[in-house]
């Protein structure tokens, strides 16, 4: 199973905000790209009750960082329907993943924003620092009106 803890670092140490018996988002977006098993085999084993017979393997030689691209104003109030450009740059790019969340196709077949959390831009690297650099470079390749993202993801690694 999976247990997910939502934590916040405070002056008095970490505080638990929530916990769930499922993957969180974007937590799954940094774990699943490192899964070496075929995900279909894993899901079928879950369905068949044979997950204990699967030797789950993960790529532990690389680090992964995910930066969420959101609509400015999220979570309170934001506009939708802005065309997203740059996604084609990641179609065959190894070690980069763009996970859709708040997107849809408009009437012209373009991918547009359709929610507060729009995309999860995930990148691998040899170290957390390199994965962070790669993720933020990838974030710059994607554009849409009212794009917002945090600039402090994995920053503690740079400051260490």
Annotate the PLM regions.
Residues 1-9, 151:
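A short glycine-rich, hydrophobically flanked beta-strand micro-motif that places a catalytic Asp/Glu
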Residues 9-25:
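Conserved phosphate/anionic-ligand binding catalytic regions in large, soluble enzymes, centered on
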Residues 9-11, 58-61, 91-93, 111-117:
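A structural signal for short secondary-structure junctions
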Residues 92-102:
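Hydrophobic alpha-helical segments of multi-pass membrane transport proteins
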Residues 103-108, 112-160:
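Generic C-terminus detector
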């Amino acid at each position: 199973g999976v247990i997910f803890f939502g934590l916040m670092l405070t002056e008095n140490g970490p505080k638990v905000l929530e916990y769930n018996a499922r993957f969180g988002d974007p937590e799954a977006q940094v774990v699943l790209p490192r899964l070496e098993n075929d995900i279909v085999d894993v899901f079928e084993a879950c369905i068949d009750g044979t997950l204990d017979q699967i030797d789950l393997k993960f790529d532990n030689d690389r680090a992964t960082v995910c930066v969420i691209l959101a609509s400015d104003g999220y979570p309170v109030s934001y506009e939708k329907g802005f065309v997203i450009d740059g996604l084609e740059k990641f179609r065959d790019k190894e070690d980069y993943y763009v996970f859709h969340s708040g997107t849809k196709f408009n009437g012209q077949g373009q991918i547009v924003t359709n929610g507060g959390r729009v995309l999860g831009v995930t990148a691998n690297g040899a170290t957390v620092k390199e994965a962070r650099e790669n993720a933020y470079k990838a974030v710059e390749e994607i554009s849409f009106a009212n794009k917002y993202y945090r600039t402090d993801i994995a920053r503690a690694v740079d400051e260490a």
